[in-house]
Amino acid sequence: CGQLVECGWVQEKYPEKKLSLQHSVYTFNRETRQLYQDCFAPDSYTAPLELNREGAGSASPQNQEMVVYGRVPMMVSAGCVKRSLGACQIPHTQKQLSQGIPAAAFSCWLKDRYNVEFPVWVNCRHCTNTIYNSVPLSLHQYLAEQKRRGIRAIRLDFTDETAEKNAEVLEFFSEGKGTAPAQYTTGHYKKGVQ
């Protein structure tokens, strides 16, 4: 579940299913994790992307997943990028939806004043955008540390990678073959949030 309302809906509709809380659900401290445990009894939760190594180390690893690769969402915006550019596709999107075709895709990039490009996931169904970091998160240097902690699972979140890139990353993280991503960030893992 990526939002609390989803957790309630899944629990109501599919009470026999196990829940897994995504990193977008606030689980930054033990009190909130306990609250979610009492309300939804999730099988696992994904460590918040804001956690640093000390914070990750203080949480119980048995039911914790951790994103170790993937572009991190930096902002969700209701100001549609396509509409701002005069390229709104709502009529086309309505036709897609009626045919069962997904109405969201990486369709543009934003460039900042340093010429760094950020991919934008445009969701035409809800007129929203998710702007992702220009480089992927990669915690490959800390995998052994997380394994020693006994973390339940690691997650690789693919967004705009090609099939070939997906295969390279999977091989690198699962078998240690190949090379680390050329450009990456460790996010808040080393420094935490201020």
Model-predicted segments: where are they?
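Active-site pocket-lining/capping segments in soluble small-molecule metabolic enzymes
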Residues: 1-194
